[in-house]
Every structure is written in C-alpha cells, then in structure tokens.
C-alpha cells in the first residue's frame, strides 16, 4: 500500500487528487463474440462516451485529461452470470472471459457460444497529480522501542517519527511510524520504504509464504479459530451457490447444503444448512473417492445415488477433490442441492407410488462432469436423459449444477488461502483436532446419559415394522435396528446414509 502524509485527514488528500469516473452501458442483444459483430456497436460506444463526457464537463477545466475505457459483459449463451472484459479482438475477449470464468467458477466450456450481453464505457476525468515538495532526510533513527503483539506473541518493535523514517531504505516489520494524523503499523512479513516525496510504501515481503506461527499440537484458541475458519468457508460456498443458481428451490427456498471434508471424506465443517443433507454427504464423498481413487486436479464429480450416500434423487451432490501442487489429494469440498426435477413418473421426481428407482428419475453415479477444468456438458445431458423417465428440464439442472461447481470452487480458493496463511501441516492437523474434539464432545454427552437399554417400535402406513434398540454403556451408544422389516416394494425405504 502507499500512504501519503495526509491520509489521516478524512482521506481529503486522496479524494482531491482522485480520478472522477462516469459509467454508462447499453444492451448488446446477445451477439456471438466470435462475430461478425454488429456495426451499430461502434455508434453505441461513441454515443455512450459522448454522454459521459457531457456529464463530467462541468468538472473539467481547459487542461482536463480524459480517459475512456470500452468494455463488454460476456457470458455463456443460456446462462445469467456475465463477466466484464476489455473491448478488443474477439479471440482476446473470449480468452480473457474464459480465464476469468475459470478463476471464478472453476470450469470453462470451450465449445459453447460466448455472447455479448452488455456494452460498457467508463469515461474518466483524470485528477491532477500534485507537485509535492521534496523532503529532507531526518535522523533515520527510531526515537524509542515498544512492545506489540505480532505473529502470535509479544515482540519489541522500533517506533519512528515519520520525518525521521529513512528515505530510500526498506525497514522490515514489525515497526511503528507516527505522524501528525495517525499511526502506521508495519507488521512482520512487511517492509516500509519512504520516498523523497514523503510517500510511505508498505509491501509484502513474504508473498505466497505461510506467515502465521502455529504448531500442529492442539491449542484451544486455535481450535476455535480453525473451527470457525472451516465453517466460514462452507458458508461462503453457500453464498455463491445461492447467488448463481437458477431454480427457485436453490436460489429462493435455499434447499442446499455445503461442507468441507478431509481427504478420506470425513466431515470437518459445514454451514448451518439442511441436516439430512449434511448427515449423509460424507458417504457420497467417500463413494466418489472410492470410484475415482486417482482423481486429478481439474476434476469435479456428481452423484445422487441413494445407495452411495444420496437421499432421494432430486438431491444432487457435486464433489470437488482439492489437490496440492504435487497433485496429492488433501481435502474435498461438496455441495448438495434439491433440484426441482430429475425425471420420474411425476413432475418433481417424488412420485407417491413409485415401485423402483428408475420411476423416480435419472440416477447419477459418481459421474465426472468437469475434466481438466472443462465442463462435460454432453456427458451430463446424456446422463440426465437416460432411462425411461428422463429429466424434464435438463437446462435448469445444468444451470444449478454449474452453480454448485462454482460454490465448490469458492471453497477450493478459500482452502488455498488458508494453506498460504498457516501451511499444510497445521491445516491438516486442525482438521483432525476438530474431528477429535467433536468425537470427544459426543462421548461426553453420551456419558451423561444413564446406562441401560431402550426400545421403541412403530409401523409405517403400509404396516412395515420399524424396531430400534438403543444401548448406552458409559461413553458409547449402540443403535440396533434388528427386528425392522426388510425393504418393501414401495418408496418408503430409507437409504443407509439417511438412517
């Protein structure tokens, strides 16, 4: 960052020299970016620019310096989310769009049409850079030292007056710089440099390295920190899923769940979403890992199989393995969403009188839907269209699954940021500590119950018997369904993961 000597004065100096921008846009009609592009767009750009110059004219003097930036919002045809790129050569625009799309959503569709949704122009009235006087060197020495908290402990740091901070020499953090309107903290891992115009430049000297000092041994404070970090990752995945989904079920009813898992498919943390999703998702993740033991970076999988961790077929789970730079599987992120329809003998894919799974819709069994970062649209369409009762609106299924892929990609990015901050050993250790702590708390809760055996029986509407016996011994509990009737010839059977 760059900090001038007036930065503490209500940011007035920065506002006074900042550029003034005007933004205008016009609908582009959805033409293919590959061309030919409509000739009327040139006229549209010129008209938008003229409107911007007119709007800023009263702030422009005779020596005004103008800047104009033409941009377009691109999207894959049939989708809602558009990304801004610079106007230019069609091939360059598509390349920039796909790079942004891969970073934001985790995949690209190289064979799909990219359309121009919006024409945009930014008209800029550039501020005047002040001719600040050169400053004379001071003593170049700190006036004293003080103690402050940095990198998990108390450290001794030099305290400089701004006028005595060295010119042209980097000072490593931790350090404090005092001026008339504020205090600047140069943290560990950063360095400060004052130039001859009295600007103080603070830069990251350990970019890309893990800087947080933390041990792999469990610490109660860090346990809570990591618990909330992982939970926050799942919550932010949910925000992306809600924002990018198309269906009412996911976008408005919020019938979805997101979670973070270890490399074995064990649940580490989840957002406060749908309990039946979260309790069963680990089995779906493990089923994917067993079906694809050699998963590679850039792969994403989908499943809704009730025999492998699913619930009912409309609940579709998207699973993204997370690998390190050497291609070793380290974590997994997953999202499950209730799709409005996946086929079956009735709309909604929850028929009251179905007698087989295929009567409830399309079954997706650990299917790879992203390979090497490319979305496998045709493969997924064929799977949704398979069987006697295919999905009724596969376009909506695809849109929501793409939203789930994007949500997972957010989780991948946030886990990568956590690794940069703490390092792999610490992150993996605290995943295990969180799981151990959860097991310990559960055991304590069971230990508070009196030892003994408790039984209950009930029957479904069709007369099928359900029997359960719970036996508590110390800190352990056994739940036994012996005596329950076998699976029946209707749709009232519970998958093992949901039981």
Features from the language model and the residues they span:
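C-terminal, non-catalytic interaction/recognition modules in large multi-subunit enzymes and RNPs
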Residues: 3-499
């Amino acid at each position: 960052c760059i900090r001038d000597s007036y930065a503490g004065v209500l940011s007035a100096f920065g506002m006074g020299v900042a550029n003034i921008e005007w933004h205008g846009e016009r609908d582009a009609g959805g033409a293919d970016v590959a061309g030919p592009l409509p000739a009327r767009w040139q006229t549209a750009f010129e008209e938008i620019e003229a409107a911007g110059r007119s709007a800023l004219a009263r702030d422009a003097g005779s020596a005004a310096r103008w800047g104009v930036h033409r941009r377009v919002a691109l999207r894959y045809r049939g989708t809602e989310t558009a990304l801004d790129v610079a106007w230019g050569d069609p091939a360059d625009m598509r390349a920039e769009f796909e790079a942004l799309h891969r970073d934001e959503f985790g995949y690209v569709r190289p064979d799909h049409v990219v359309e121009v949704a919006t024409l945009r122009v930014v008209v800029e009235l550039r501020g005047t850079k002040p001719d600040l006087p050169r400053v004379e060197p001071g003593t170049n020495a700190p006036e004293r030292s003080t103690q402050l908290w940095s990198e998990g402990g108390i450290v001794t740091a030099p305290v400089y007056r701004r006028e005595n901070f060295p010119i042209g020499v980097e000072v490593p953090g931790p350090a404090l710089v005092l001026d008339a309107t504020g205090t600047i903290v140069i943290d560990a891992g950063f360095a400060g440099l004052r130039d001859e115009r009295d600007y103080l430049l603070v830069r990251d000297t350990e970019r890309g390295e893990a800087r947080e000092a933390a041990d792999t041994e469990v610490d109660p404070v860090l346990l809570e920190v990591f618990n909330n970090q992982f939970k926050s990752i799942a919550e932010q995945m949910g925000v992306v899923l809600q924002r990018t989904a198309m269906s009412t079920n996911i976008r408005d009813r919020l019938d979805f769940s997101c979670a973070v898992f270890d490399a074995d498919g064990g649940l580490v943390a989840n957002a406060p979403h749908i309990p039946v999703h979260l309790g069963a998702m680990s089995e779906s993740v493990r089923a994917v890992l067993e079906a694809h033991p050699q998963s590679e970076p850039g792969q994403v999988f989908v499943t809704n199989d009730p025999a492998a961790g699913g619930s009912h077929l409309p609940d579709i789970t998207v699973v993204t393995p997370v690998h390190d730079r050497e291609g070793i599987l380290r974590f997994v992120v997953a999202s499950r969403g209730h799709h409005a329809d996946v086929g079956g003998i009735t709309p909604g894919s929850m028929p009251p009188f179905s007698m087989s799974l295929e009567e409830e819709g399309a079954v997706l069994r650990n299917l790879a839907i992203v390979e090497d970062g490319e979305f496998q649209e045709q493969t997924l369409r064929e799977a949704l269209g398979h069987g006697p009762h295919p999905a009724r609106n596969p376009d909506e299924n695809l849109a929501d699954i793409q939203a789930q892929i994007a949500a997972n990609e957010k989780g991948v990015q946030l886990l990568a940021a956590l690794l940069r901050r703490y390092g792999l050993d610490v992150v993996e250790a605290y995943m295990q500590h969180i799981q151990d702590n959860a097991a310990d708390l559960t055991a304590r809760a069971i230990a508070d119950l009196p030892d003994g055996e408790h039984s209950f029986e009930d029957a479904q509407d069709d007369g099928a018997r359900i029997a359960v016996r719970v036996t508590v011994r110390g800190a352990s509990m056994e739940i036994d369904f012996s005596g329950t009737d076998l699976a029946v010839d209707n749709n009232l059977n519970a998958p093992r993961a949901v039981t």
